[in-house]
Regions:
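Active-site beta->alpha loop and helix N-cap motifs at the rims of alpha/beta catalytic domains
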Residues: 32, 69-146
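Mid-to-C-terminal alpha-helical segments outside catalytic/metal-binding sites
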Residues: 275-292
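Alpha-helix-loop-beta-strand connector modules within alpha/beta enzyme cores
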Residues: 13, 61-89, 153-162, 214-222, ...
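N-terminal small/glycine-rich loop or linker at the start of catalytic domains
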Residues: 2-27, 92-93, 97-102, 131-139
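Conserved, mostly hydrophobic/aromatic
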Residues: 35, 42, 53, 130, ...
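Glycine-rich, proline-tolerant flexible connector loops at the mouths of alpha/beta enzymes
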Residues: 23, 48-72, 141, 198-199, ...
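Catalytic alpha/beta core domains of metabolic enzymes, predominantly
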Residues: 129-253, 263-264, 268
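Histidine-centered catalytic micro-motifs
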Residues: 13, 32-37, 47-59, 84-89
Length: 292
């Protein structure tokens, strides 16, 4: 496939995530105040979109408490920083099996909720965007399964559409993209369609360029896509996204290092992405332009 370089690119910053990065870097925000502050700094560095999870302020463990999301969104809005808020709706589909020999009982970390409960914070905060993880997968080398059934995803998409909240499809593998196209064909999600290709996360789609292009070649031409990879491949994927006609995601959810041995802030990761985008001759879009 010939190169289809993006001449205009928007940057998403994934601010904190739900993994254990908070135990590895002091820069990973935990409290709503810290998450909002980091999101604002990322926006000022050049991110048009901030993708936010929340954490328990004391333990740093992932949470889906609506009051925490409410505080994050209110703090960002009260700062009068122009940025598009994108809230995760991925929480509530987490199944942790006991072990390979004794899968039951499930571990205490298991958190499985219905579609309405998983969307409660979206109802209360009304972000411009919320995510929809369009499938299930074995997540990493543990007994954790990210579980998202078709009926649950359809209901969540219907709730978001009724709230006039734009859905960002998260596709971790080809089957997720296939299901997203079915949601579109069934009229459950409306254009314009925004999709994030989540690459290199075990055990979804690997982040080699052949697999990336296979995913991209299966995206309808009028859909808007971003893509990212994790860890040391985060910044190389900024260039890959631009060269393949897509948009960019960076942030501490996916990578905690600025370079080998140097822990990053979200703003620093965005600044580094900005340098790559501009060095490749592309224009960085602001939130107003992205909305249009």
């Amino acid at each position: 496939m010939p190169l289809n370089k993006s001449n205009e690119v928007f940057i998403t910053c994934a601010v904190t995530g739900s993994g254990d990065a908070h135990n590895k870097s002091p820069h990973v925000p935990r409290s709503p105040k810290e998450i909002a502050k980091s999101a604002i700094e990322a926006a000022k560095a050049g991110a048009a979109i901030v993708h936010c999870h929340v954490r328990d302020p004391e333990s740093g463990e992932p949470s889906r408490r609506p009051d925490l999301y409410k505080e994050v969104t209110e703090r960002i809005r009260d700062s009068e920083t122009d940025v598009i808020i994108n809230l995760t709706a991925g929480m509530g589909g987490d199944v942790f099996f006991g072990s390979s020999e004794s899968p039951l009982p499930l571990k205490d970390e298991t958190d499985v909720a219905g579609a309405s409960d998983r969307m409660q914070h979206v109802k209360e905060c009304l972000p411009e965007i919320c995510t929809l993880d369009c499938g299930s997968m074995n997540f990493g080398d543990t007994d954790y399964v990210m579980a998202n059934t078709p009926s649950t995803l359809r209901k969540m998409a219907e709730i978001a559409s009724a709230l006039d909240v734009r859905i960002e499809i998260e596709a971790f593998d080809t089957g997720h993209l296939w299901f997203a196209k079915r949601l579109f064909e069934d009229g459950i999600i409306k254009p314009p369609i925004l999709i994030q290709l989540c690459m290199g996360i075990p055990w979804g789609a690997p982040d080699d360029l052949n697999t990336l292009m296979a995913m991209i070649n299966n995206i309808p031409k009028d859909w808007v896509f971003s893509t990212f990879s994790i860890g040391k491949n985060q910044m190389p994927y900024v260039a890959a996204a631009i060269l393949s006609g897509g948009n960019v995601r960076v942030g501490l959810e996916d990578n905690i290092y600025l370079k080998r041995g140097v822990l990053a802030t979200n703003a620093q990761l965005v600044e580094q992405a900005v340098k790559i985008v501009e060095s490749m001759g592309s224009k960085i879009l602001g939130p107003k332009e992205v909305r249009e």
